[in-house]
């Protein structure tokens, strides 16, 4: 998608995927408006990373929205009484790191923000191939939310809809790492770990996915 002269609200968590989407948008000369959420998560390191990435790419604006989902919990990311899973990724199950309704809430806020500033796109780092089992990172979810977005606001009703831009949706994680390198993403400044320690734990699902992807990326790189 050609993003030159377009404006994009990007959900920027500070992780690998959203930072790569930001890098792609910057390389495409889009005007970028970053949006992060302080939603009662276990730690704020990802917000620090999001701020760092926003500064790195010199985006137009960066906002952090306070929205406390820990009020009702339901996830090990918002309820410290729940243990983070460290036994490896279980296939065909939704892990307890899933935050009920998180992407639906975040994208809805982004849609409001995008319409208010007359943005063209909402950039999302969702990835269907190497996702952690979350229901709101899948192609059918994105398709249906786009249909909802087209009906839910003035722009959509006037046949000038705000598009959900998901450039990573069908990519392997190792290909996303390559995209990150190709688009000047400072990977060392991104944060994927579910824990808020000084260093990534190396045990949670997010760390495992990233570690496995990096090993596969290294193998591909050595083969070329």
From Swiss-Prot:
Originating organism: Prochlorococcus marinus subsp. pastoris (strain CCMP1986 / NIES-2087 / MED4)
Q: What is this protein called?
A: 7-cyano-7-deazaguanine synthase
Pathway(s) per entry: Purine metabolism; 7-cyano-7-deazaguanine biosynthesis
Top EC group: ligase
Q: Where does Zn(2+) bind?
A: 193, 201, 204, 207
What EC identifiers does the entry list?
6.3.4.20
Which gene produces this protein? queC
A UniProt-annotated Pfam family: QueC
Paste the cofactor note: Binds 1 zinc ion per subunit.
| Keywords on record | ATP-binding, Ligase, Metal-binding, Nucleotide-binding, Queuosine biosynthesis, Zinc
Query: Which Gene Ontology BP annotations are present?
Result: queuosine biosynthetic process
Job of this protein = Catalyzes the ATP-dependent conversion of 7-carboxy-7-deazaguanine (CDG) to 7-cyano-7-deazaguanine (preQ(0)).
| Record field: catalytic activity | 7-carboxy-7-deazaguanine + NH4(+) + ATP = 7-cyano-7-deazaguanine + ADP + phosphate + H2O + H(+)
Which cofactors does this protein require?
Answer: Zn(2+)
**Under the GO molecular function aspect, what terms does this record hold?**
ATP binding; ligase activity, forming carbon-nitrogen bonds; zinc ion binding
Keyword Zinc assigned to the entry: answer is yes
State the family it belongs to.
Answer: Belongs to the QueC family.
Q: Where does ATP bind?
A: 12-22
